[in-house]
Amino acid sequence: MGDAWQRTKRITSAAFRPVRGRDLSLHAAAITFYGGIAVVPVALLAIWLTSLLVGGDRVRRLTSYAVETLPNAIGAPRAVDALVAAGVELTPLLALASLLPASLYGEGLRRAFVSVAASHTEESLVGWRGRLLLLPLLAPAPALLLSILIALPTTTRLVRQGGWIGALGVVLSFLAVWLVLTPVLMWVFRVVGPDSPDWLSTLALGSFTAANLSGFLHGFVLFASLPLDLGAPFGGFDEIGACVAVLLWLYLFHVIVLAGYSATLALSRWRASRA
């Protein structure tokens, strides 16, 4: 038991060596700032591209399953419904205008990753590199989003039944999000990040990080269903409380992403040293 514990400590210490001495919380907060600007434009572009591929009516029909199932405590169904409607009705000109704020997410990720990858601390044009390297992810966005939307009728129907059948629906939903996030994180870790870890390390840790993020996102849905008075700390303004809650969860989301990138770099460097 003692040897297993010591081995676990050594592995954990090695995984977080790239972020040792750096303020992980501050970098996660920085990504959250950029992400807060980019999250709506990214979602709009993904929905718009998907609607061009399969039609707006089908996108509305598939997303309606999620809208009907999401908890209403912080207004999530109304927000998702409005987001889908705006994305489906997006014009090419508005889509072009959304590209700039959407690309800011890549800048935030690249800047944070540069601070973790010590070999690139003097890199120039960090922001623009991150923006341009993130944009190719828009190409597979319709296929990735559609794979989740196609699973929604089945998973939401199972969740509504409750009990063990409902638990099966949650598991299937978890697996769908996990499979979609894995290639996204592989691209982010290997291409958007300044250091390019080897493919095996990227696949292993990218998939593991995606599994954690999938569970985390489902945890947010559970949180949104709790009867909490989010406006209490803000003078009764529920909208402000809901926004702060979303930003807090987005911040924790990026802590996991940074930790995953750090572990990927550590594994890749360890494998290179053994080669």
Where are these regions (language model features)?
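Membrane-embedded alpha-helices and immediately adjacent juxtamembrane helical segments
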Residues: M1-A275
